[in-house]
């Protein structure tokens, strides 16, 4: 791990402890090797998209090719490790949701509530970074099948900010 573990701030120290603990627990679903937190430049090279970002990368990379992005603030994984095919499906699922959001002029949280209702999942389960290829295909299909005029009217409750 490249980041310093010793720190003055108690909160930051706790975050680092959680990261180290989490890092030990992450295993690749493809080859069962451990995954480690690495600079994104390992995978992407010295590109603008890699600057200051981190990934959890299978320790057998590049042979295995499984990785997942880390949250910028907490450095916890954004989902499960994914190979190239699954990463591509997740990108397509995010694009489908974004298109539905734009077509319906919805907030992001509204789109996710719509998706939760359609998939019968709760908020903790509705993260594309956790989805399999099958679930990503379901998201894409639901978004493509949703008539814009209907899907825009499916969720009309007040926002959590209004409550």
Can you annotate each of these PLM segments?
Residues 21-27, 51-54:
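Short metal-coordination and nucleic-acid-contact micro-motifs, chiefly zinc-binding Cys/His arrays
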Residues 118, 122-139:
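Short, compact, well-ordered microdomains
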Residues 28-31, 58-61:
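Short cysteine-rich clusters marking metal-coordination/redox-active sites
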Residues 137-151:
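Long, highly charged low-complexity segments enriched in Glu/Asp and Lys/Arg with interspersed Ser/Thr
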Residues 155-163:
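Single conserved hydrophobic/aromatic residue that forms the stacking wall/gate
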Residues 33-48:
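Short recognition patches in nucleic-acid-associated and regulatory proteins
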Residues 89-104:
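Positively charged, polyanion-binding regions of nucleic-acid-associated proteins
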């Amino acid at each position: 791990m490249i980041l310093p573990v010793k720190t003055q701030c108690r909160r930051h120290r706790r975050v680092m402890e959680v990261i180290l603990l989490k890092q030990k627990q992450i295993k690749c679903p493809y080859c069962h090797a451990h995954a480690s937190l690495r600079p994104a430049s390992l995978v992407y090279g010295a590109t603008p998209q890699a600057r200051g970002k981190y990934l959890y990368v299978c320790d057998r990379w590049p042979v295995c090719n499984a990785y997942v992005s880390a949250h910028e603030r907490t450095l916890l994984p954004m989902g499960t490790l994914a190979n190239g095919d699954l990463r591509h499906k997740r990108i397509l699922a995010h694009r489908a949701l974004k298109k539905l959001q734009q077509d319906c002029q919805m907030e992001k949280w509204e789109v996710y509530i719509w998706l939760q209702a359609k998939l019968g999942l709760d908020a903790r389960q509705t993260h594309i970074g956790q989805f399999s290829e099958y679930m990503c295909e379901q998201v894409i299909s639901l978004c493509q099948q949703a008539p814009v005029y209907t899907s825009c009217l499916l969720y009309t409750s007040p926002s959590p900010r209004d409550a």
